[in-house]
Amino acid sequence: MVQEKAEIMDQEKFNRTLTRISHEIIEKNKGIDDLVLIGIRTRGVPLAERLAHKIEEIEGESIATGLLDITLYRDDLSTLSEKPILNKTEVPFSIKNKKVVLVDDVLYTGRTARAALDAVIDLGRPKYIQLAVIVDRGHRELPIRADYVGKNVPTSKKELISVRLSEIDGEDRVMIEETVKE
């Protein structure tokens, strides 16, 4: 059983975090020329869309977004199930020489980010790839770090970070949850 342990971000803090990350992306990339955002399914997709919208509000110009399904790139595919559920990758633009920002909700072991890097490289050769996450919870198993982090939240391995999004969960909120024995 999982129970809520603490709230990390309420709706207001969540929105402020997305605004800050949007400004950081613009600043680090010296504007939005050749900039694209690609959300990692599932929760990275609405986050990428929201960041793109905020960047458009700031810069007055829209940027392209896509979505990435990393299922076949996972290194734990054989342990997931015999028939993994595949979703479509939708990147309706060339990534050649683009500044790609991968977007996900939580950075943990680094394995999802590694799979996403492999998936992007299969689409072409971008100028570079950056990573934006709402929460970095530590416990890396691979040498991967995010370029943009909403909040660093050190956790124990038995704790979970739950990023709730209005598009999926009906609310914007980040929680620490803990697995408890019944």
UniProtKB/Swiss-Prot annotation:
GO terms for biological process: DNA-templated transcription termination. Keywords: Glycosyltransferase, RNA-binding, Transcription, Transcription regulation, Transcription termination, Transferase. The gene is pyrR. It catalyses: UMP + diphosphate = 5-phospho-alpha-D-ribose 1-diphosphate + uracil. Its EC number is 2.4.2.9. Homodimer and homohexamer; in equilibrium. Regulates transcriptional attenuation of the pyrimidine nucleotide (pyr) operon by binding in a uridine-dependent manner to specific sites on pyr mRNA. This disrupts an antiterminator hairpin in the RNA and favors formation of a downstream transcription terminator, leading to a reduced expression of downstream genes. Also displays a weak uracil phosphoribosyltransferase activity which is not physiologically significant. The keyword Transcription applies. Belongs to the purine/pyrimidine phosphoribosyltransferase family. PyrR subfamily. The keyword Cell membrane does not apply. GO terms for molecular function: RNA binding; uracil phosphoribosyltransferase activity. This is Bifunctional protein PyrR. The lineage of its organism: Bacteria, Bacillati, Bacillota, Clostridia, Natranaerobiales. It comes from the Bacteria. A motif (PRPP-binding) lies at residues 100-112.
